[in-house]
Each structure stands twice: as C-alpha cells, then as structure tokens.
Amino acid sequence: MTLHLTRQGATLRLRQGRLLLEEEGREVAGFPARQVRSVALWGNVRLSTPALVFLLRQGVPVFFYSLEGFLHGVAGAYPDPHPAHLRAQFAAEGLPLARAFVVGKLRSALALLERHRLPEAGGVVEALARAEGASELERLRGAEGEGSRVYFQGLARLLGPYGFGGRTRRPPRDPVNAALSYGYALLLGRVLVAVRLAGLHPEVGFLHAEGRRSPALALDLMEEFRVPVVDQVVLSAFRRGLLTPSHAEVREGGVYLNEEGRRRLIQLFEERLLEGVSHPLGFRKPLGETIEVQAQRLKAALLGRGRYTPFYLWR
C-alpha cells in the first residue's frame, strides 16, 4: 500500500500499530502500519517522530513533495552504496549506458506515435538513428533533444484541445504540462528508490550532468519510463475525460493541478504501475517491478555481469 497524503495541515501519527492521519486533533483516516510500503507527503503534511522512526525501521521510503510536484527528497533506511558498486560507477564507460537510456526512451516514443499513426514518427526514427550512431555524449544529447521535441509535437495533435502545444516546464503553462510535470515527479521518486535499493549511488550518472543534490543516475534510468508510465497516463486521462482543464489552476506564474487533479493523477499513476508490460528480453512484469528490475540489471552491467538492455514499449 502506498499512502499519498495531500490534506494540508494534517499530521501522520503512529498509534497502537496503526498510522493515523489527524487534522486539528481529529482522526480523518487510519491505516494498518505494517501494510504500508511507501508514504508520500505533499506540501504541508507533517509526520510525527514516532511514525518516522517506525517507517525508517521498516525500510519504508518517505517521499517529500511540494504541492507543485517538486521532489524535495526521500527518507529511508537505505545502506550506503557498496564500495564495489561505487568504483564500478566511476570506472564505467558512460557513453554506451547513456545511449541505452536514450534509445529506450525514443523507441517508446516511436511506438506511441505509431500507435496513433502520427506523422511525427518519421522524425523520431531519424533521431533514434542519430542516437544509435552517436560517438560523443553531446551528439547523443542532441539526438535525444530533437527526438523529444518532435515527439511532443506529435502529442500536441492529440492533446491540443486541452491547451497543449508542446512541452513547457518551470513553470508548466497549461493543464497537460502541469500533469506531465507532476507525473514525472512521482516517477522520479520511484526510480530513485529503485536505484538506492540496487546499492548504486544516485548522483553518479552517465547521461545527465552530475551535480550536488542532483540524482543524475535516477534521472538517467527514468528516461526509459517517461513515455510508458507518465505520458501514457496523462494522454489517456485527458482523452477519456478523467482529467480536464478544470483540474488545474493558475498560480505563481504557472499552471498547476488543483487538489482534485492531483488526487486523480496519483490514482491513475499507481494503477499504471500495477499493469503488466512485456520487456524486450521476453519476460512480463508489472511496470512498478520493471523499474526495480532495470535498476538491478544496470548494477549487473556495471559489475561486468552482462550487457544492459533498456526497457521500451515494443508491442
């Protein structure tokens, strides 16, 4: 069970084996503590010290998000990266791994565009060929950027009626971009936990620039799952009327999901992670588990135990 707590001003407490959400001294929700697998606190939601200590001892990750969808960080009882894993990360040839992340992302983008018979698929094919043949990191990044730009042009054909004309961020400028940004924050939290559980250092990456407090490796691995998880959820939600422009609001110079919009997107995101998908290597698992599998396979590749194969939509 994943708890997403969005009730502003509420406090999560531990009492007699249950996690209780209280507001002004009044219990508004209760959960069996040992059935909780992760907790996400959104905005001004507090956590008592006994509850935090219990969650840490149980190895339950606690995500701290802003209401706008910025991931402040994750608390969890994770061991430090294994020295052998850390040495392997620093010693690895980065370009092949960076290429794998980009190729996975662009192949999923191509699959989605082809599924909807959008003409922008041709542009993604060209970007994919450039990425596969890139001999330098900057050229690879250029191919990824061009492929993403064309891909979002294709999505604009499907989502234009909802104000979407292309990807905008910091701040998002329309309801679709608001949902995408919020969904990517959710996804980053999941990938970050998977990387840590694999015993890897999340700040030592290969595609994204490294920087203090920047989870470069988690951002790298996340590229494979943007389209299959977040983009598909957002596209389906707007086209089915589960999300509408009424679920967003203008504030602080941008457009952000309102409380009901956040609640709906969180539910759809969690449901998507439970859906089974076929991996290019032939096995089938829920998407949430596939994220963890890819982190473990990345570790194996870094330790010289096999070649890394990215995940992507292929059928």
From Swiss-Prot:
Entry EC no(s): 3.1.-.-
Keyword entries, A-Z: Antiviral defense, DNA-binding, Endonuclease, Hydrolase, Magnesium, Manganese, Metal-binding, Nuclease, Plasmid
Keyword Zinc annotated: no
Secretion signal span: none
Gene Ontology MF terms: DNA binding; endonuclease activity; metal ion binding
Subunit text: Homodimer, forms a heterotetramer with a Cas2 homodimer.
Protein name according to UniProt: CRISPR-associated endonuclease Cas1 1
Gene that encodes the chain: cas1-1
